[in-house]
Amino acid sequence: MSLLGSISLTSGRTLAVVAVLAVLSLLAGAFLLPRWTPRHFPRRTRHWLGRAVLILVPILLVTATGALILNRSLGLVKTSGDLAALIASNVDEPAAESGGEVTISDQPIASSSLDATFTRTEDGMLTTTWTGPISGITLPVFVIAPRDYSPTDGKTYAVIELLHGYPGEADGTTQGAHVQEALDNAIDAGIIPPTIIVVPSLSVDEEAHDCADIEDRPAVYTWSAHEIPAFVRHNFPNTSDKRDAWMLGGFSAGAYCAVWTAMRTPQTFGAAASLSGYDTQIEGQMTNLGDQYLADNTLSTMLAKRVPDGLRIYAMAAADDGAGGAPAAVKMAKAVKFPDTVTTDIPPTGGHAGPLWREHIPTMLAWWCSSDKVANALGSSPTAATARASEAYASIVPATNVTHTVRPTAPNGLVSLAVLALLSAAFVTLTWRFAGTWSAVLAGDADASASRSRFFRLPMPRVIAELPRPVASCVTYAARLACLSVVALACAAFIGVCANMAGGFYTSWSSVAESFMEGLR
């Protein structure tokens, strides 16, 4: 990977460098604005170009700073190379229909091929880079174990496998969702029995990841449904091999894959959790297998057609999720046949973002063990009563119908967009036409007459002109700096709202603020 392509977009150092550059661009811009006068640059083209640079550079750097902060909250894009690949994948021509889904027969896995050596990350997760013996996929795998875990502690552990979304990565998603904290708290409170969480990477290339084994593509289904469970049982031998002690969950695109995979692999998974998932796949190569394939692999259709075997599904999505997560949950609940069950959890707000998932990880854990199926599979003490009495379980908002609405003043609302557009236009105009005149000049100075030219309309106010020159210089510099700062912040917010409306992530300003605080940690 080239040097430019290897720049980390999640490190505090990168954020600090860009933030410092943004501040310096504001300071320099405020200093140079009055020096871009017609006297210095009488030709209009040079004057306009210089003034545009002084305004655009701070806007771009402040926007980049905000984007880096939000990206750090979930680690969605790791490096500049990943960002370039993500952009390229979204502008390329749509792929043609591929050869279709393939079935890889069960193959014996040699015990030695399951061996792994783990290291511990800064936040306490165990990690290794491992190669699936059947799929050939080589990717990082992260394991979150309880704080007192030991393979010789005499306990039998349940297992939760979590699948990240796209864009995104295993470690960033789990760190941003505070999964380790939620796991330890739930175990300490007796809400769930001892449990290990495994989070495999699904990023086999720069494309959106798949759920299925597709011809001429890496065998992601084999990796997540067969190899990862075998990997866990081998390296953590005190984990249960019983279906009811295993749950497969996911976020966004990973949520669709979690429910899809759990239905395809009933011998392994007795429960599934969908956090802001879809009913029909909208990403990856599965979308190129034809309309009939997509219809057959719609989750509500699969639930209606499958032979029910007691699969339990937790389907959470905010009612204002623009990606359709809430309608997907309701459709699954209406299609399910007993003894399969679907529990819907539809909070009124939350969008399709990290703060919502962070809030509902404890809810997912409480729901999972609100049935004693898990405890019975482990032979441990019952948890259902404790789980059902918990605040997390009480927060579930069941729904049978949902209506998607967008608040006009939300980060994805038209009023917010219009206000920021007007604010940006007003302050860009103010900075472009007037801020350059806010400087302390002596009577008869050539700049004084130039400041009254077509492009610099306002002379220095009398109240400032009467101040001592050093004080007046500081006051006018502060005014230019404030004006340019407002321009940069307003335009950055406008760009952010446009991107948010396209992506459908945030639906409340509080969730934006929460992600900012998370990204600054």
Task: Write out the residue ranges for each language-model feature.
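Non-catalytic cap/lid and distal C-terminal segments of serine-dependent acyl enzymes
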Residues: M1-A448, R452-R521
